[in-house]
C-alpha cells in the first residue's frame, strides 16, 4: 500500500475520533452570548487538537492507485483507472459513446 493512502487513512481515523469535540468547540466559540475569556480558552483547546484531525486535511484518493487528483466521488476511482476499467468492460452499464 502506498504511503499516501496510509497517511490519508490515518487522517480519516483522527478526523472520526475528534469530530464531535471539534464541532462542539467551534459551536461554543462562535456563540456570542458566552464570556470572552471562556471563548478564548475554548479556542486554545481547539488549537491543541491534532492538526490532522481537521476535515480539510482529508483528501479524496483513488482506492486503486492512490492518485489525489481528478477522483470521482461516486466510485472513489481516478479518471484514468475509470477509463481503463470501462474499456476492459469491468464496469457494468458503462459503454464508450459513439454517434
From Swiss-Prot:
Its main location: mitochondrion. Keywords: Mitochondrion, Ribonucleoprotein, Ribosomal protein. It is found in: Mitochondrion. GO terms for molecular function: structural constituent of ribosome. The lineage of its organism: Eukaryota, Viridiplantae, Chlorophyta, core chlorophytes, Trebouxiophyceae. SUPFAM superfamilies: Glucocorticoid receptor-like (DNA-binding domain). It comes from the Eukaryota. GO terms for cellular component: mitochondrion; small ribosomal subunit. GO terms for biological process: translation. Belongs to the universal ribosomal protein uS14 family. This is Small ribosomal subunit protein uS14m. InterPro entries: Ribosomal_uS14. The gene is RPS14. Pfam families: Ribosomal_S14 (PF00253). The keyword tRNA-binding does not apply.
Amino acid at each position: 500500500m502506498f504511503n499516501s493512502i496510509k497517511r490519508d487513512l490515518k487522517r480519516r481515523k483522527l478526523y472520526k475520533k475528534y469530530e464531535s469535540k471539534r464541532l462542539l468547540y467551534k459551536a461554543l466559540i462562535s456563540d456570542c452570548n458566552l464570556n470572552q475569556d471562556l471563548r478564548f480558552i475554548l479556542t486554545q483547546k481547539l488549537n491543541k487538537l491534532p492538526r490532522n484531525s481537521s476535515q480539510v486535511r482529508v483528501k479524496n484518493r483513488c482506492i486503486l492507485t492512490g492518485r489525489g487528483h481528478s477522483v470521482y466521488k461516486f466510485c472513489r476511482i481516478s479518471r484514468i483507472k475509470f477509463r481503463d476499467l470501462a474499456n476492459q468492460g469491468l464496469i457494468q452499464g458503462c459503454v464508450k459513446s459513439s454517434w
